A protein has these predicted regions:
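Short, polar/acidic, helix-capping and beta-turn segments at strand->helix junctions
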Residues: 1-85
Length: 85
């Protein structure tokens, strides 16, 4: 999950945190093969598309969006991904 009051801000923040972790592990977003997105309101996923397209480029990884409650109501999106080494 990321910081911010909107789903867009939290999406950007989460991706920045994840990018740092992926790069520290010796990989990159170009090597991401799978992403899971968890949102309490599936309708909020659409505003994230431009942010995700910018992050993953022309060949995005396989993805699943799950509508579910998150640990705290202030969180609008949680992102989980798998990247190759």
């Amino acid at each position: 999950v990321g910081q911010g009051d909107t789903v867009e801000a939290q999406c950007r923040s989460a991706l920045e945190t994840i990018r740092g972790a992926v790069e520290q592990a010796g990989s990159s977003f170009e090597k991401v093969v799978r992403v899971n997105y968890y949102l309490p309101d599936g309708a909020e996923f659409e505003p994230c598309w431009p942010i995700l397209a910018e992050a993953f480029g022309a060949n995005p990884p396989a993805a699943t969006m799950v509508e579910c409650n998150l640990i705290d109501p202030k969180y609008r999106i949680e992102i989980e991904l798998t990247a190759l080494a």
